[in-house]
């Protein structure tokens, strides 16, 4: 008896997930494989994916357009949280995984599957994100991860697939592993595994090389409503359209590249190249608007929560109780975060140069050093005495010892 009768497989069209189809059937005795591809803005690569899955042995191939859900339910909360992993990575790839896990569970329940499957290896982050997400959404579903168990090298995997007519898109001249969605691209493997090797320019698609960027700066006004981006240069835009247009605008100026060594969930370090032009600029602009509309103590407390939020996303805990509790806090903080932020784009740099809000708690009359100054300077002496009293008492008791 096989490990499962009917399986829903997360399918990308790449060699690993394509090989999973015959492997599940031939090696693990699965009777029926249904593939599911989530359209998260990958572009043309989804075109032939259904035909390829059926050719590899799937009984049905599903493509779910989840771009709007991806932006509204996953990207926007992350922007409200200013979520960055290790203070740099805006989680453009990681954010897609809990949504794909949700779609897998929904498809399994709809089609009566007794298991779901993915093509993640045993040393990556995605296996954790998928498995934990699926467990949280439907604990009764089995999760099959053939690539984690089959023990084949990359070359052996390609050779196995060739027996079933599966061609590999990975060539010696382009040995990179690439993941793409509307929020960005991640590139790894090949020569990038040497941390001293400069990434070749041809791996970048969303961002221009500095030499090819415009010679004049460009400004963009980003409008927010309760922490959610809603407009560009005064024009209200649908969520997917806003991200897409901002990607093009920001990437044109060479903004949005990351080259970093990160700590994976499984305990190893990896070298990752990311392109996430819109997401990086939106987080920067949103954080700046918060500085105008939130009190200092809320801002400072939220910064610590933001780091935890990024960790939860990266480590596959999107559906955890802690994440849900933090969401409630963040939503409360965003009630006043409405306004616009002006960003200057030029030669690989995105710089906030202006911000405004009807909820601004910045008072020019209190901040100015000019004649309009309304700050009560005399009150400072009493404040300083009370503020410094613990230090004064401590010094009196300890300095003489």
From Swiss-Prot:
Instruction: List the InterPro entries.
Output: Arginosuc_syn_C, Arginosuc_syn_N, Arginosuc_synth, Arginosuc_synth_CS, Arginosuc_synth_type_1_subfam, AS_cat/multimer_dom_body, Rossmann-like_a/b/a_fold
Catalyzed chemical reaction(s): L-citrulline + L-aspartate + ATP = 2-(N(omega)-L-arginino)succinate + AMP + diphosphate + H(+)
- Which terms under GO biological process does the entry name? argininosuccinate metabolic process; L-arginine biosynthetic process; urea cycle
Which GO CC annotations does the UniProt entry carry? Answer: cytoplasm
- Chief site of localization: cytoplasm
Positions of ATP binding: 10-18, 38, 119
Q: NCBIfam families attached here? A: argG (TIGR00032), PRK00509.1 (NF001770)
**Assembly with partners or alone:** Homotetramer.
**What is the protein name for this chain?**
Argininosuccinate synthase
- Originating organism: Microcystis aeruginosa (strain NIES-843 / IAM M-2473)
Q: What is the phylogenetic placement of the source species in the record?
A: Bacteria, Bacillati, Cyanobacteriota, Cyanophyceae, Oscillatoriophycideae
Gene symbol? Answer: argG
């Amino acid at each position: 008896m096989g490990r499962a009768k009917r399986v829903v497989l997360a399918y990308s069209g790449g060699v690993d997930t394509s090989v999973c189809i015959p492997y599940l059937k031939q090696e693990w005795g699965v009777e029926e494989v249904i593939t599911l591809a989530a359209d998260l803005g990958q572009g043309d690569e989804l075109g032939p994916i259904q035909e390829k899955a059926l050719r590899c042995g799937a009984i049905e191939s599903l493509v779910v357009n989840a771009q709007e859900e991806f932006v509204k339910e996953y990207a926007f909360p992350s922007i409200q949280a200013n979520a960055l992993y290790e203070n740099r990575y805006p989680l453009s790839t990681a954010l897609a995984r809990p949504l794909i896990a949700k779609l897998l569970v929904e498809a399994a329940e709809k089609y009566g599957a007794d298991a779901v499957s993915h093509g993640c290896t045993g040393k990556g982050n995605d296996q954790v994100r998928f498995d934990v997400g699926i467990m949280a959404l439907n604990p009764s579903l089995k999760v099959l991860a053939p690539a984690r168990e089959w023990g084949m090298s990359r070359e052996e995997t390609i050779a196995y697939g060739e027996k079933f007519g599966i061609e590999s898109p990975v060539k010696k001249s382009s040995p990179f592993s690439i993941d793409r969605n509307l929020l960005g691209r991640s590139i790894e493997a090949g020569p990038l595994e040497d941390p001293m090797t400069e990434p070749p320019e041809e791996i970048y698609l969303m961002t221009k090389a500095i030499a090819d960027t415009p010679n004049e700066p460009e400004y963009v006004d980003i409008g927010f409503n309760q922490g959610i981006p809603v407009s560009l240069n005064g024009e209200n835009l649908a969520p997917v359209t806003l991200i897409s247009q901002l990607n093009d605008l920001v990437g044109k100026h060479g903004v949005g590249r990351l080259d970093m060594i990160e700590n994976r969930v499984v305990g190893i370090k990896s070298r990752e190249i990311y392109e996430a032009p819109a997401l990086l600029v939106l987080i920067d602009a949103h954080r700046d608007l918060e500085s105008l509309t939130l009190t200092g103590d809320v801002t400072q407390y939220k910064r610590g929560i933001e780091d935890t939020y990024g960790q939860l996303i990266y480590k596959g805990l999107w559906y955890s109780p802690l994440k849900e509790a933090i969401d409630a806090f963040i939503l409360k903080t965003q009630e006043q975060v409405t306004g616009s932020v002006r960003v200057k784009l030029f030669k690989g740099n995105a710089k906030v140069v202006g911000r405004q809000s009807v909820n601004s708690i910045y008072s020019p009359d209190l901040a100015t050093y000019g004649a309009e100054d309304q700050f009560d300077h005399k009150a400072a002496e009493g404040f300083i005495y009370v503020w410094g009293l613990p230090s004064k008492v401590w010094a009196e008791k300890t300095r003489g010892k």
